[in-house]
Amino acid sequence: MSALEWYAHKSLGDGIFWIQERFYESGNRANIWLVRGSEQDVVIDTGLGLRSLPEYLYSSGLLRDRAARDNAACRPLLAVATHVHFDHSGGLYQFDRVAVHHAEAEALARGDNFETVTWLSDSEVVRAPSPGWRARQFRVQAVQPTLVLQDGDVINLGDRQLTVMHMPGHSRGSICLHDKDRKILFSGDVVYDGSLIDWLPYSRISDYVGTCERLIELVDRGLVEKVLPGHFNTFGAERLFRLASNYISKAGICHKVSTFAMRSLASLALRVTNSRTSP
């Protein structure tokens, strides 16, 4: 299957494109965002990486065609992972320039498929990307980040800037990217319109509460009008406020006890199926 078949996209205007993996039918299917700038283009999250995402970007015309890739006028391309979970980081190995938060840089560099929580089934991939492909073969490949991010860093695209916000809770290195001028938040799995997951090996409820308080502050200060999340549909500031507030209100003792049990089971299952280093 070609990259043009595997991916699909739609334009949200203002240089932003929403890309998805058509034949990965799962709640884990991540949104991939392309943000075009005057001096640099940024891909936010890369999906599973079962087909070449860079090839799709050039072949579909979203970026300059392959013949122009080495041209001095061709803008550089940076792939940013909002966190290293497999559904977001699987395609990072396809890019020359890769950025991730420092808390997860080591896990990515060694191909730690326990921390990337790799968990994929044949039933979720409704058309095999290549003959004989099986989900049990899938692993997140080790990638050495070329840019290690910290809270407050700014990724300069020329005519727009994306500010890095370290937002742990879902994972220890989760980030949002905030376009302050346009009041857009690329939220990864920090927040999306669904049940927030805080029971994975490196999830932490206390961190998540702090993150949600920070999200509420963004809304209260009028700094976010649109959220482009890591899963499901986009939403606005009012919904962001409600999702963050609901998480805080539910993060009591009962929730912590049930989450501890779920995390223990998830960690056991992931340790059985995944190694801490890439083969």
Swiss-Prot record:
Cofactor binding comment, as recorded: Binds 2 Zn(2+) ions per subunit.
N-acetylserine: modified positions: 2
Post-translational modification: Palmitoylated on Cys-254 by ZDHHC20.
Membrane topology recorded in Swiss-Prot or TrEMBL: Lipid-anchor
Residue intervals passing through the bilayer: none
Required cofactor names: Zn(2+)
Residues at which Zn(2+) 2 binds: 87-88, 189, 231
The reaction(s) this protein catalyses: hexadecanoyl-CoA + H2O = hexadecanoate + CoA + H(+); dodecanoyl-CoA + H2O = dodecanoate + CoA + H(+); tetradecanoyl-CoA + H2O = tetradecanoate + CoA + H(+); octadecanoyl-CoA + H2O = octadecanoate + CoA + H(+)
One family name in Pfam for this protein: Lactamase_B
GO MF annotation: an example: long-chain fatty acyl-CoA hydrolase activity
Cellular compartment(s): Endoplasmic reticulum membrane; Cell membrane
Top-level EC class: hydrolase
Keyword vocabulary terms for this entry: Acetylation, Cell membrane, Endoplasmic reticulum, Fatty acid metabolism, Hydrolase, Lipid metabolism, Lipoprotein, Membrane, Metal-binding, Palmitate, Zinc
Family of the protein in this entry: Belongs to the metallo-beta-lactamase superfamily. Glyoxalase II family.
Protein function: Acyl-CoA thioesterases are a group of enzymes that catalyze the hydrolysis of acyl-CoAs to the free fatty acid and coenzyme A (CoASH), providing the potential to regulate intracellular levels of acyl-CoAs, free fatty acids and CoASH. Has an acyl-CoA thioesterase activity towards the long chain fatty acyl-CoA thioester palmitoyl-CoA (hexadecanoyl-CoA; C16:0-CoA). Displays a substrate preference for fatty acyl-CoAs with chain-lengths C12-C18.
Full protein name: Acyl-coenzyme A thioesterase MBLAC2
The species this protein was found in: Bos taurus (Bovine)
